[in-house]
Amino acid sequence: MTETVGKAAGGAATARELTFRGIALGGAITLLFTAANVYLGLKVGLTFATSIPAAVISMAILRVFRDSTIWENNIVQTVASAAGTLAAIIFVLPGLVMIGWWQGFPYWTTAAITGTGGILGVLFSVPLRRALVVDTPLPYPEGHAAAEVLRVGSGSREGAEESAKGLSVLVWNALASVGFAVLTQTRLVAGEAAVWFRTGAGATGISGGLSFALLGVGHLVGLSVGMAMFLGLAVGWWVLLPLLTAQAPQASDLAAWAGGIFSSQVRFFGAGVIGVAAVWTLLRIAGPVVGGVRSAIAASRARNAGHALALEERDLPISGVLLGSLAVLVPIAILLWSVIAGGPLAGSEAVLIAGAVVFVVVFGLLIAAVCGYMAGLIGASNSPVSGIGILSVVAASLMLVGLFGRDQDAGTTEALVAYALIVTGVVFGVATISNDNLQDLKTGQLVGATPWKQQVALVIGVVFGSLVIPPVLDLLNTAFGFAGAPGAGPNALPAPQAALISALAKGVLGGDLNWTMIGWGAAAGVCFIVLDEVLGRLGKLRLPPLGVGIGIYLPMSAILPVVIGSVIGHFYEAWADRRGDAEFARRMGVLTATGLIVGESLWGVAFAGIVAASGSDAPMALVGDGFATPALVGGTILFLALTAFLYRRTRKLVG
């Protein structure tokens, strides 16, 4: 696996890249990150990005080998991030337990749903690399951050002094981020706060999270996306929520009342905006995508004709991608047949399997492009893949309504709902891996990696993840169960996205889904598209409609720190542009943000293990709810002071 190459990033004559030890290390990291992501996703509906923590761990371990390289470390983070990202399948599969179709998670069926969708996600996004990674101005915030971590950790920058400064910034900011995150778990400082209040007959609220990771993400995504998300936040929380709560019966618990309406109505409005923005995104990138496919075909012909391509430009052969995609459809068809056989849908195998396979291919290709674009725009960890899951399950359910209608008995309807969830699970695997894949390939491009080797590593990561996820899911189901499932106990895991997606499938197939909010969201999405295009033509700051949709869809506590981070990043970059070495100053800014993300991400893994081992939601809490006000005041002051100190320190190091 070692070959002689001319690596652009380091100029090494011989580079170790796709090695057995790298794959083994990536697999070991996978066990930790995937299990942690599965638990956290079911508990709070969020997962964390694993690329940067995996890169940091890899560099720390492989540093003992004198022949380790930046490209080998890149392979490790690629394997680990693919498996960690695949854990987002928990946003769909627990729905099968919630509706009573499954009692647990059958190992091979769960692994097949997860693995086939993930591998298709890798293959479908191969021809997108040229269009969405090479020939694009998309920022890829996490891809850039991971590349900076690899560069600094490997010492590959020119000039020992610059490397030392960069590593210092990364480590200091990571330690500060970890320290603050630890304090929030003790509850001596608040990690999040929300205030709910009435607005006439309605209600709304203001909430914010004290998260250095989200602050760093805001710096990396930039002012345009940050302001688009702020517009979405304003529309969702300060326009829609007051209007909708004013029309609903009032309740004594203001937070539960308004929060419930946000989840059941405002989020659907946001999903409508995301859907229209996703379609518009697809139309805008259709030309580059077609060009990317043509480039891939041309590259394959050039290689067959004996013309050498630079290693940094070699993808998996397009012929292999096509054959591989067709080959993966075979186990998908077998999987679907096993679901149908002997049940209420028996006798309709041909039409159901054919319809589902066509749906997986067509819809999978569309969302692979859209999810790749989303990753480039705002980063994989902030992409609303659960919104894509909503659109997928609605589309899959409508396909089944078209084939069977709605006048079915209860047993057949339940079987159709389960079938829709399984098809959605495969498509969701395509979405999550496409979202992560292009982010990893951007990292590879920045460090001079070989694309086809990364694509192989991504497939390996998918296989690792698909083998780990089923037993973890089954263990958590046995120990806690899921809220809404038959026989669920008081400690059942909420699994909010799975609950929503399964409810949508039942609503569409049962004929009782309210399309009003999705329709209004779609109409608003068109308006946001027009606004963005007008701003672009006027040369003003653009407001990407997908960013607006995300701002509506996600909680304010997740959006506000990103918005603040984008403003801080804007002012920092304006300062950096006035320096003598603007590029170095900008890179130091990226490392500042990266350190903030790295620290909190690594702590997220550690704390997930503590929570799982202790069985307590707050195993490190030192004070109770009575300390909430001092914790909020003290936490806010400490957060602001640390932010100012860390950015000032970076500026002093830049000089």
Predicted regions mapped to residue ranges:
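Alpha-helical multipass membrane-protein architecture
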Residues: M1-G655
